[in-house]
Amino acid sequence: MKTALMLIAHGSRNAAANDDLYALAEELHHARVYAAVEASFLELAEPTIDAAVRRCLLQNAERVILLPYFLSAGVHVRRDLQDHRDRLAQEYATVEFILA
């Protein structure tokens, strides 16, 4: 089963603040552990979660691990990301979405 890893951060209007996530995604991509590695942001930056999922699916991912990249497990991690996972699972019923 082709598994993709999708890193999800909050996002910032300050583009430089988002660079760490892009760098981590690039390093993980080069490790070739996953069929695809994508960075995504909950808000304020691109790509969005939906856009990153589409990129994973274009690379034929059958499973997508949604990995939160947050300092603490606040409302976004405990509630919002679970809501995204549930919606994606309904929209793409043939793909397994795992919220790590």
Residue ranges and their predicted role:
Residues 1-100:
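Active-site-proximal alpha-helix that buttresses catalytic centers in soluble enzyme cores
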